[in-house]
Amino acid sequence: MIRQLTAAALLLAALGVQTAALAQAPDWAKIRIGVEANYPPFSQMAPDGKFSGFDIDIANAICAQIKAECTLVSQEWDGMMPALNAKKFDMIVASMSITEERKKAADFSDSYYDIPSAWIAKAGSYKEVNAAALKGKKIIVTRNTPRAKFVQENFKDSEVLLVAKEAEVTMELAAGRGDIGFGSSLAATAAFLKSPEGKAYAKVGTPITLGGAAQGGGVGMAMRKGEDSLRTKVNAALKAITANGVYKSINDKYFDVNIRGL
């Protein structure tokens, strides 16, 4: 009898917890989004505090589609995942590559763009890029990224300069603190190579795709583990803005090619 009562009590307790959880489940009428403040043309913050860029427009389009009131929160790259899991915001829209390592810490939306990585150096400095060509050279790459892992695993005879932000790859390169940069092909083309600072530079070697959307990678929006209702809403909204042309209009505002990659 004691066992039966205990089992019944446990069942009632479990049902109570489940009911409470359902009652407390967020409806996502308000969403806080972590974004980066210095990664043009994907995101940047003006002196007046207003954000702009591809990621920003995509985030706003997702919010409009699901009829949510969204607040953008500026966050340094290295603190993105810790801040997400500390509930500083509810999701990250910051050109974050989907990797197996990151999927241990967060859930991701479907990929919303997918572009290769590129080598950037002084024009004409390298006919090809490989471990032999870069032996003894200093490679600049953003830390805590698939690109950093790729460089550290495949260019062991090169010196590696790890920087905090993607924008710092080309900034450090232009300042003469490295021989070659490894970063976003699109960011290099759309921003740095069109700037006065990038006039003497060019993409060199062959672009490399690291775990693209076809392999379950690409770039996604990160959410806390278990926030399935938010992920479902975001994925549905992403499909909707792709189908209704909103995504294309945002894409064409910033880029000459389709970066959806799907």
What feature does the model see in each segment?
Residues 45-47, 59-67, 131, 135, ...:
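Ligand-binding cleft/hinge of the Venus flytrap
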Residues 57-65, 125, 133, 137-138, ...:
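Extended ligand-binding regions for polar small-molecule ligands
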Residues 79-82, 96-104, 153, 179-214:
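A ligand-binding cleft/hinge motif common to bilobed small-molecule-binding domains
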